Each structure stands twice: as structure tokens, then as C-alpha cells.
Amino acid sequence: MSSVTTPAPVYTWTADEAIKFLKEWNFSLGIILLFITVILQFGYTSRSMFVYVIKMIILWLMWPLTIILTIFNCVYALNNVYLGFSIVFTIVAIIMWIVYFVNSIRLFIRTGSWWSFNPETNNLMCIDMKGRMYVRPIIEDYHTLTVTIIRGHLYMQGIKLGTGYSLSDLPAYVTVAKVSHLLTYKRGFLDKIGDTSGFAVYVKSKVGNYRLPSTQKGSGLDTALLRNNI
């Protein structure tokens, strides 16, 4: 005698249950969305580096969460049409995630900075101050870059980098590293304001496929930009 298997019951969400869920979780969801909105709105390197790092973490988590949700949609698709769209979205999300990692690794090889894995931009401005390389992200590669020193505090494009510097410490060149090439900016103007303050304007002068010069003494690489075929 063969046993008859009964199909598992399909649970459906009623409108009343949905309204009840929103009433119970509305306050928490509102606080979470408000927190994310404030972080995304005010997370800039020129304002607060701590808030900016939190913003980068949120943006970085968006990709794996998107992939998880699209895979979930594939497993629990409502019909074949939803399944087809879910498969396409999953493939696109995974490909873009892989491309992000490939570009970030290439940029890391070029600069050696963990800012290369910034999900917001692939532009890293770099300045060598007395053998110390400062690397920070910028949204785009501008035609000019401004470096300011205010009472020994070093700022580049409004982003504070360090202290204990003077105008005489400013290099002749700064760079903006991208995935496929390196932009070189030449100092075109320097003005001193008072005894310990001033600024310099750097103008884009050369574009090439290079990596950052080494700052290690004795390597023979301090004054040259090296060819990089990646």
C-alpha cells in the first residue's frame, strides 16, 4: 500500500499581517533608514574621515546583500518570468562584483594603498611629503589640485593629511592614480600667506601607464615613474 504525500502548505501574507508588520517595525526601519541617509549625505573625506569610512562600509555591503537577495529570488521565484529576471540580475550583480575586485586589486598594485578598495571611486590622489606617501580618494580627476598648508597642517583638496610641514616641503609633482593609468600634476603656482601658511596649485601635465615611485632609499626608484603593464 503506497503512502500518499501531502503537499506542504503554501503560506501567503495577508494585508492585515503586512500592516501589522509595518506597525511593529516602522520605528526601527525609520531609524535605520535615517541613519543610512545621514551617513550617505554627509560622509565626505573633507568633513569626517570616521563618517566617511562608515559610508564606505555601507556601500561595500550593498553588493553582497544584492547578490544574496537576487539568489534568494531565484530560489523562491513566483513564476518563470520572475525566475528569468532574477537569474539575469544575479549574473549582472556577480559580474559587477568581480569587476570591482579586479579593478581594486589593479589599483592596489599601482598604489599599495587600501583605499584602492574604495567602492565609491577609482581615483586616488597621491602626494609624497618628505618620503611619506599620502593617498586619499577623490571623486574625479580634476584639471587642477590644490595643496594647502595652514600653520603646519597639510591639506589636499580640503582633506587633512598630516602635520609638521612647510611650503618648502611641497613636491614638484603630485599624482592621481587610476586603474589603467597615472595622472601627473606639476606645480604651477605657489603663494605664501604669513610665516607658516600658504598654498600651491598643481596642473595636470602628463598621463601615462605608470605606478607610484618607490620611497625606499637605495632602491634607485625614488625619482622615476615605473612602467606598469597591468
Swiss-Prot record:
Residues 1-24, 77-84 are virion surface. The keyword Membrane applies. The chain crosses the membrane at residues 25-45, 56-76, 85-105. GO terms for cellular component: host cell Golgi membrane; membrane; viral envelope; virion membrane. Component of the viral envelope that plays a central role in virus morphogenesis and assembly via its interactions with other viral proteins. Its main location: virion. InterPro entries: M_CoV, M_HCoV-like. It is a multi-pass membrane protein. Signal peptide: none annotated. GO terms for molecular function: structural constituent of virion. It holds the Pfam family CoV_M. This is Membrane protein.
